[in-house]
Amino acid sequence: MLVIHIISTEDTREFSGIYEGLEASVLINPGASVAKDALKEHDTVMFIGHGDGYGLYNERLNGYFVDSSWVGMLRDKTVIGIWCYAGNFADRYGLKGFFTSNFISNVSELVDCGFDRFDHADQVISHENERFSNTLNEYLKNNVPMDRWVCSLQESCSRIPYVQYNYEALYYSE
């Protein structure tokens, strides 16, 4: 598996637990040509960072790292997309794999999505990011079939409203 982790803000760093201890080639904030060359050697690729339905943002958040120009290279891959609206990107281009939708990973996103700020929100959000990451890591280590991830995650998520919001729109596509 190839992991491409675009660390643009501290909250994106919290998702490194997803690939910790896995046999994976990990690229942190790589150049596009390096990433595209590495992609040729792998059947599964995981992208982590911030983004929207049109792609994964670059580390400066002023453009895209992954956009429609990548689609041809991704069509025959299994993709794990961990960025806001990755599921929309996958659906738009017919990609297969596991994807998040709008995924609240920091306090400003919490407020932007209409949730009230609460005491210790920073710590709770960090804890839930870590919990999500550790769960995906276990699924990957134990070869849990990807088509079971969404249901399993939704059944096990905490009852905090924003967490339920995050998990309700997880997306799997074959």
Tell where the protein language model's regions lie, with residue ranges.
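Active-site-proximal C-terminal subdomain of hydrolase catalytic domains
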Residues: T78-E174
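A short, glycine/acidic-enriched catalytic loop
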Residues: D52-L74
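Short, T/G/N/S-enriched strand-turn elements that build extracellular solenoid repeat scaffolds
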Residues: V34-L39, S68-G72, D91
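Short acidic, S/G/P-rich loop/turn micro-motifs used as interaction or catalytic elements
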Residues: T9-E14, G31-S33, H50-Y57, Y85-F89, ...
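Short, glycine/charged-enriched secondary-structure capping and boundary segments
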Residues: Y19, E59-N62, G94-K96, C113
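A domain-level signal for caspase-like cysteine endopeptidase catalytic cores
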Residues: M1-I48, I80-I82, L153
